[in-house]
């Protein structure tokens, strides 16, 4: 039995789960929030209990120390030597990594270089990794890349129709994101269907505040909606997704704004928030739809339109589809959003959906299509943390 910790760090947060492997038992989970702000918060769940404490967390090293102290203080581990490995989520690994890897100086250097493509994520990942390395110097560390699963895409899927030198000189191409989630949902759906993942054609829909859709043929990614960065693809909570590039410099001229200003508009003020004028939270948007708010209704229609355009294109690229799986915040919990999407696709794809069942399913595995549906439709809650733990155990030989 080995204890390994899965780590998912952001610029101001640190989420964790401690697993007992190979049973995959979650011993504890939680997060540190508002790191670097005047007052932070630390939450930990264990033995059916949940504790939240507000306290200053000036940096990730302090967050890691608080976490490790809590593990022994609460008796979750007798001593920190019981932890044999740490797996870290890395948002951007570019084309350099097609699988998870044990961390060494060269790996660390490459991840740092890719920070230009993920300035909010990769630097924070490295700060957190170094904090764990300092506090737990005798354990192995593994990097698990959001981009790795997508490295099987063919050139026609990952290349952009821009000057070729942009690709050779500046690495401009589609990398995708949420790969660990898409990989888990792909394999788990195959298990639920009783099928070999290497014989299935599937479309996985990771619909959260950030959202991406992936076409998977025989267990390998054929295409994915996010692009060079997580700004590309479908409409999201605050991100615009794919738009006519002319909009960017046209509006920069009109508004007299800087590139940083435009980055804020596209990443933080667009998507559901931008269209609804209400919120980036789909629950608030649904409340507006239920109340008959015109912009709320438009937001729902626009989101549905963007999703089905991608799913439809992937259907043709795959040739046929055995299953469509919904996951992440909206995908797992928003039955109204799922219903709008499925009703928009049912005639074209030959879907037969149990909408009464769909309305009752929130955050649990379920087949919501009927036996006569040409494509099975599943809800499969994602579990990126367990994938990180599995890869950590495998690569460290625990």
Across the structure, where does each feature detected by a protein language model lie?
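Short glycine-rich, Thr/Ser-proximal phosphate-binding strand/loop in the N-terminal lobe
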Residues: 4, 13-58, 227
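Glycine-rich beta-strand-to-loop/alpha-helix junction loops that act as flexible
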Residues: 10, 88-92, 207, 325-333
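Phosphate/pyrophosphate-binding loops at sites that engage ATP/ADP/AMP, CoA/4′-phosphopantetheine
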Residues: 69-83, 189-196, 311-322
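Short beta-strand-loop/turn "lid" adjacent to the catalytic site in phosphate-handling enzymes
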Residues: 71-121, 142, 148-157
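Glycine-rich phosphate-binding loop of actin/hexokinase-like ATP-binding domains
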Residues: 149-252
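Adenine-nucleotide phosphate-binding core of ATP-dependent small-molecule kinases
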Residues: 264, 271-275, 282-317
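Glycine-rich phosphate-binding loops at beta-strand->alpha-helix junctions
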Residues: 322-345
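Glycine-rich phosphate-binding/hydrolytic loop that grips phosphoryl groups
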Residues: 332, 354-398
């Amino acid at each position: 039995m080995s204890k390994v910790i899965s780590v998912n760090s952001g610029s101001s947060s640190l989420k964790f789960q401690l697993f007992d492997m190979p049973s995959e038992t979650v011993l504890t989970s939680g997060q540190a929030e508002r790191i670097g702000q005047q007052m932070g918060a630390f939450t930990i769940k264990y033995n059916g209990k949940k504790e939240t404490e507000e306290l200053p967390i000036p940096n990730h090293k302090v967050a890691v120390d608080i976490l490790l102290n809590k593990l022994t203080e609460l008796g979750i581990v007798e001593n920190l030597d019981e932890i044999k490995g740490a797996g870290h989520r890395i948002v951007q690994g570019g084309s350099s990594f097609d699988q998870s890897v044990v961390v060494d100086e060269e790996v660390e250097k490459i991840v740092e270089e890719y920070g230009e493509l993920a300035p909010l994520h990769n630097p924070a990942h490295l700060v957190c990794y170094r904090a764990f390395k300092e506090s737990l110097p005798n354990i192995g560390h593994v990097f698990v890349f959001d981009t790795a699963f997508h490295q099987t895409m063919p050139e026609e899927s990952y290349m952009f129709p821009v000057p070729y030198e942009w690709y050779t000189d500046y690495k401009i191409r589609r990398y995708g994101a949420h790969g660990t989630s898409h990989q888990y949902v792909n394999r788990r759906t195959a298990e639920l269907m009783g099928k070999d993942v290497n014989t299935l054609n599937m479309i996985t829909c990771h619909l959260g505040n950030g959202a991406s859709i992936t076409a998977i043929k025989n267990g390998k990614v054929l295409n994915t909606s996010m692009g060079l960065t997580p700004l590309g693809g479908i409409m999201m909570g605050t991100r615009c997704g794919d738009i006519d590039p002319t909009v960017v410099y046209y509006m920069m001229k009109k508004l007299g704004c800087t590139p940083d200003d435009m980055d804020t508009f596209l990443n933080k003020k667009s998507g559901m928030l931008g269209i609804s004028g209400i919120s980036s939270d789909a629950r608030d948007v649904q409340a507006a739809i239920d109340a008959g708010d015109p912009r709320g209704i438009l937001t729902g229609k626009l989101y549905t339109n963007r999703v089905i355009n991608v799913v439809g294109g992937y259907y043709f690229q795959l040739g046929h589809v055995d299953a469509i799986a919904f996951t992440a915040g909206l995908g797992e919990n928003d039955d109204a959003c799922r219903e709008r999407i499925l009703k928009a696709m049912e005639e074209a794809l030959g879907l037969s959906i149990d909408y009464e069942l769909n309305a009752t399913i929130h955050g649990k595995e379920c087949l919501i299509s009927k036996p006569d549906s040409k494509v099975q439709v599943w809800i499969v809650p994602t579990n990126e943390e367990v994938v990180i733990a599995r890869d950590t155990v495998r690569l460290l030989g625990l």
